[in-house]
Amino acid sequence: MNTSIAFIGGGNMARSIIGGLLKQGFDRSRLHVSEPYEPTRTALAEELSLQVVNDNMQVALAGQVWLFAVKPQVMKAVCAELRETAQAHKPLIISIAAGITAAQLDAWLGGNLPVVRVMPNTPALLGAGANGLYANVRVDSGQKHIAEQLFRATGLCT
């Protein structure tokens, strides 16, 4: 996969996805991570040998795919920050945030975007998860394939 991925949020689930991708030989130079919490940022950078920043916009501009791994209570604010850029670049949007629908995410980012909503489970942290994926009507077959490849790094996909 020759896709650049912007991880907006670098918590445990993002870490497991990134770790799985690296184990599969994914080019780490195509992984861009933003994480607001300094101790998590430092740990992620050291553990996975990645540059991790505290700048969602910088990361978003580097990614063809935006993977949102932020707490649900901050999702709307994060989307507001990135809305203009999302509309200008039309990235594939993937979210693992609990309780946020694909329709909400699309609306918060300005609409008419390809959005995949993923429900990973806890065993994904060990690479043994089962991930349920839902794609809205704007997600094409190539984008579905990308989303499936990303989450196969943590287990099964349906």
What is the role of each PLM region?
Residues 116-132:
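Active-site capping/gating segments
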Residues 32, 53, 94, 116-118, ...:
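Hydrophobic/aromatic beta-strand patches that form the interior of the parallel beta-sheet core
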Residues 12, 39-40, 73-74, 100, ...:
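Short alpha-helical
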Residues 1-61, 128-129:
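NAD(P)+-binding Rossmann beta1-loop-alpha1 motif at the extreme N-terminus of oxidoreductases
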Residues 19, 42-47, 65, 104-107, ...:
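Non-catalytic structural scaffold of enzyme domains
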Residues 104-114, 130-158:
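Internal alpha-helical scaffold of NAD(P)-dependent oxidoreductase catalytic cores
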Residues 54-109:
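Rossmann-fold NAD(P) dinucleotide-binding segment
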